[in-house]
């Protein structure tokens, strides 16, 4: 018995989950992991435009939060979230990407940010003294895109994300 989902057929066979897009395998870019550019039409740009169109069609008018998740590290959630965010920003949507993979942060790589960038873990570790909005970084890719990176890997990631302050303060940045 096979326990690994390897392709679209596996997803369709064992789930009722709708597939919004199927991304082709791509070479890693030299700098960062953003593979789409404004006004280009290669296969990745078109694939992310298709994902964006399907996502917007699927979401309700007032739905403004999209969660990207996976079962294991290295499956591409930061890559897909980052490129989808850029695609939405190029459409004129205001977007903030919030890095919550605080065990193995990757947004710094995706957006070519400093590995020392402060982020949500700084805030969650000391919410009384750290301003959440000071952790947000403006993207040089689009004026419509901001990033709240994960921050340094904490010794207690589970406890940090379980804090009530997280839910309350993420509602402040809800666009």
Residue positions per predicted region:
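Flexible phosphate-sensing "switch/lid" loops adjacent to ATP/NTP-binding sites
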Residues: 151
């Amino acid at each position: 018995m096979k326990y690994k989902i390897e392709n679209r057929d596996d997803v369709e066979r064992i789930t009722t989950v709708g597939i919004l897009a199927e991304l082709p395998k791509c070479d890693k870019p030299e700098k960062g992991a953003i593979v789409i550019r404004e006004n280009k039409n290669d296969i990745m740009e078109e694939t992310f435009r298709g994902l964006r169109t399907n996502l917007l069609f699927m979401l309700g008018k007032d739905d403004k939060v999209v969660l990207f998740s996976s079962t294991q590290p290295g499956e591409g959630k930061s890559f897909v979230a980052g490129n989808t965010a850029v695609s939405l920003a190029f459409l004129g949507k205001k977007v903030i990407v919030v890095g919550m993979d605080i065990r193995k942060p990757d947004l710094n790589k995706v957006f070519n940010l400093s590995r020392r960038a402060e982020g949500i873990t700084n805030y969650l570790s000391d919410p009384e003294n750290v301003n959440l909005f000071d952790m947000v970084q403006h993207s040089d890719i689009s004026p419509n895109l901001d990033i709240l990176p994960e921050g340094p890997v904490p010794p207690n990631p589970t406890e940090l994300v379980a804090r009530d302050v997280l839910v309350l303060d993420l509602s402040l940045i809800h666009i």
